[in-house]
C-alpha cells in the first residue's frame, strides 16, 4: 500500500471517530487538507477549506455509530509529490440506510506530509 493509499484509510478512520463519536482533534484533521482544498460532495455543491471547517465543527458526534468502510482503492496516477486515487466509501449507521459513494481524490506530498487538494464524490444509486 502506498503512503497515499494509507492516507485515504487513515483520514476516514479520523472522520469516523469525529463524526460518529465526537472523538479526535478537529484542528489536526483540518490540517490534512490544503488551504485551497475543494470538495464536491454527492449534492454537487462546492466546498472549500472554510466550508469543510464549518461542517466538521458543527457535525462533531452527530452520526452516532457511524462506520466507514473503504474498498476498491486504486491509484489512478502518481508522480513524485502527489497522486490521484479512486475508491468506494460505504457509510453505515444503526437504523439508517447504507450510504455508498465513489470518490476521486488528489493528494499531494511535501516532505513526509500528505495533504488533500481535491475530493469529488458521486453517490452510488
Segments from the language model and where they lie:
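A beta-strand edge to alpha-helix "cap/lid" segment located at domain peripheries
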Residues: 2-28, 38-125
